[in-house]
């Protein structure tokens, strides 16, 4: 079942799903879509082992944030397996996430693999503030985690947003993801000031705890016609230690097309990917010398495909299976990955997760499996025949996974424990779960080398280690012959 909360630019998506035999509802707004979801849930038999699948395409990013952070009512979650998104969020996942069986026309943010010893970092520059800009930014923050940060915490992914009124967008983003930004480095520059200054925000526990957020942010109040912006774009495009991607996301599609071809020339010469948000996935045929602008890539709603979400959920169910396997081991048994995946129990285990927020945690994990394989030099063409990781690869990816998880949890509304709460848990480990469930304070939101033992006496990093061990198994089980 597909429920869409707005007809705006969603007709191609609805038509494809109807043609595939899916039940499709198009509602007038998010409230009507949620009401439709509840009505359909009421028709379902709660005793059925397999729940009805629903892909819920919302209009407002705040509605999506609310569902991801707080979930749905239990009567809906018991009967319907919901994967909520917006068309902007779906499009961002289509662009940034590498999945089995699904070819992407877009280059990865990390076009060259970033290993532990690499000195390069990913830099995403978003021009224009809109719902699509926000979706690209948040999905990049969920995906772009690399091993070299583990060696040098200065090597963070950077997300820069440039807009004539970026300060309003920044404030809304920070208010929505307050715990992410409380614990991140970000700077703001207003080029409209007479003497622009970089105003720097530092993590709330800087110099008290080790750095654990591997994404930093930059908000520039200006546009691509500012000399300072053009100079920076040129510098970044020539920097061999940056893997730069530029995305135009103004609400005005014609402005995106115009500005995508007005960047400093080194950007085109260096073949820096320039993503241009348009209505019909096409750019105007305005240049006789198309090769000079071959790195300008249009993207639009026609590329939204529910198959992206279907594959993500398929992977996420297997991630959940690995976690369940680890927690099913007897006390004293070493935590390790399973040797196979029992596909007969995937749906029932997914239902037993019992929380939409926890399901998103598995989905966000699944979004980075391809990026992790890329960081150890394995491209999608290798996935089918790659059976196991070396112990060194597992060690590296385990730390990357913790860093990824930390950003995910901050996005989902969790925060690190305060010094007082840390003392409480240090004295009584049973308080860890209570604080997590009642205050959304997570004891494990800390640097990798500061992770502690859980109630079983094992360091919590063993679960990430088992999951990384299982990456080839998870991916191979989703590859079609």
Where are these regions (language model features)?
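Cytosolic regulatory regions of ion transport systems
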Residues: 1-342, 347-404, 408, 413-422, ...
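In a subset of proteins, long, contiguous C-terminal domains/tails are tracked
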Residues: 427, 432-434, 439-481
């Amino acid at each position: 079942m597909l429920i869409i909360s707005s007809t705006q630019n969603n007709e191609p998506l609805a038509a494809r799903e109807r043609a595939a035999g899916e039940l499709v509802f198009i509602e007038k707004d998010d409230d009507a879509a949620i009401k439709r979801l509840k009505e359909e849930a009421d028709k379902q038999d709660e005793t059925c082992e397999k729940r009805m699948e629903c892909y819920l395409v919302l209009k407002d990013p705040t509605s999506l944030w609310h569902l991801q952070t707080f979930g749905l009512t239990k009567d809906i979650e018991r009967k319907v397996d919901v994967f909520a998104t917006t068309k902007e969020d779906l499009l961002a996942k289509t662009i940034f996430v590498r999945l089995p069986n699904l070819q992407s026309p877009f280059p990865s943010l990390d076009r060259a693999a970033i290993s532990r010893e690499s000195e390069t970092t990913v830099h995403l520059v978003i021009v224009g503030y809109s719902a699509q800009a926000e979706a690209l930014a948040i999905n990049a923050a969920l995906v772009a985690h690399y091993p070299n940060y583990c060696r040098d915490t200065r090597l963070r992914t950077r997300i820069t947003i440039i807009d004539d009124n970026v300060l309003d967008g920044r404030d809304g983003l920070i208010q929505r993801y307050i715990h992410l930004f409380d614990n991140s480095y970000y700077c703001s520059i207003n080029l409209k000031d007479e003497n622009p200054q970089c105003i720097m925000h530092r993590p709330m526990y800087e110099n008290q705890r080790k750095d654990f957020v591997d994404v930093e942010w930059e908000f520039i109040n200006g546009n691509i016609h500012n000399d300072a912006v053009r100079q920076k774009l040129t510098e970044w495009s020539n920097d061999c230690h940056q893997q730069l991607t530029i995305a135009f996301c103004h609400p005005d599609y014609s402005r995106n097309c115009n500005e995508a071809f007005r960047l400093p020339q080194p950007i085109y010469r260096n073949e820096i990917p320039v993503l241009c948000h348009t209505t019909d996935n096409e750019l105007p045929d305005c240049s006789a010398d198309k090769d000079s602008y071959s790195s300008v890539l249009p993207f639009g709603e026609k590329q939204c495909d529910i198959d992206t979400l279907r594959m993500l959920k398929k992977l996420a169910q297997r991630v959940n299976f690995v976690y369940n396997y680890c927690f099913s081991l007897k006390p004293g048994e070493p935590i390790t990955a399973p040797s196979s995946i029992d596909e007969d129990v995937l749906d029932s285990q997914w239902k037993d997760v019992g929380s939409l927020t926890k399901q998103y945690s598995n989905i966000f994990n699944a979004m980075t499996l391809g990026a992790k394989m890329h960081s150890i030099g394995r491209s999608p063409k290798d996935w089918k025949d790659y059976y196991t990781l070396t112990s060194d690869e597992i060690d590296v990816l385990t730390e990357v996974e913790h860093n990824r998880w930390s950003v995910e949890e901050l996005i989902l509304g969790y925060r690190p424990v305060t010094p007082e709460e840390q003392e409480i848990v240090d004295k009584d480990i049973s308080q860890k779960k209570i604080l997590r469930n009642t205050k959304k304070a997570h004891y494990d939101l800390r640097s990798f080398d500061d992770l502690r033992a859980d109630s079983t006496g094992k360091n919590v990093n063993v679960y990430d280690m088992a999951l990384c061990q299982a990456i080839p198994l998870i991916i191979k089980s989703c590859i079609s012959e």
